């Protein structure tokens, strides 16, 4: 039996990309997955995939920028299932590699609101239950853009640095309460993040250009000479949610094919 059997795990942004891959893996390992996101069609498809495989999952439309909606997602999971064992913050939008000069006020606000504020709101909502319970695992999906300065655009880089900083603070501050907070920092992963970000950003969306528009950039930047797949991120996430990571907190785990090791 998997150690995640019967555990209640809330995830934001679990309908696509790395989040979806995490949902599918953890549900297969027996976790009850409570998904919050705003892409309803993709959310429904993810829930169906889990249930068709015999797992348990549910989707709740949640805008992570909205305190009341995030609180409702987490509080609802506790109300319906009796507890929350884990939280994964995966909701994010991308800035299309927009430079500082090319970053509008609206783009900056939108990226920071989703990526940084959204992560904070979900962590806070979960901690309100985890701290009194004396246990809990939080995994934030950051990025190598939160560790270095030239992997992404200005607003995305700033937002992911914020996620890394928040992870370190919360991981240290709540360690004595039995709650661990860690992050995964993926590199270039094969997802629909650009198309989804254009949909989510709407009028605030910039051209999705930059380094990613060059088909050969991966060979130059990544020692493995390929992009990663979403399911290659899920092993670290599963580990950080488990008992094997009981002495790990405030840490950021890089999975980037060697990009930042050069």
Give short role names for the model-derived ranges.
Residues 128, 172-176, 246:
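Alpha-helical segment proximal to the catalytic Tyr-Lys
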Residues 3, 120-123, 131, 135, ...:
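C-terminal substrate-recognition "lid" of short-chain dehydrogenase/reductases
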Residues 13-16, 39:
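Conserved glycine-rich cofactor-binding loop
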Residues 123, 159, 167:
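Active-site helix of classical SDR
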Residues 88, 175, 180, 248-250:
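Short, small/polar-rich loop/turn modules that mediate ligand/substrate recognition or access, typified
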Residues 98-100, 104-112, 138, 218:
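Substrate-binding pocket helix/loop in short-chain dehydrogenase/reductase
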Residues 143:
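Residue(s) in the substrate-gating loop at a strand-loop-helix junction
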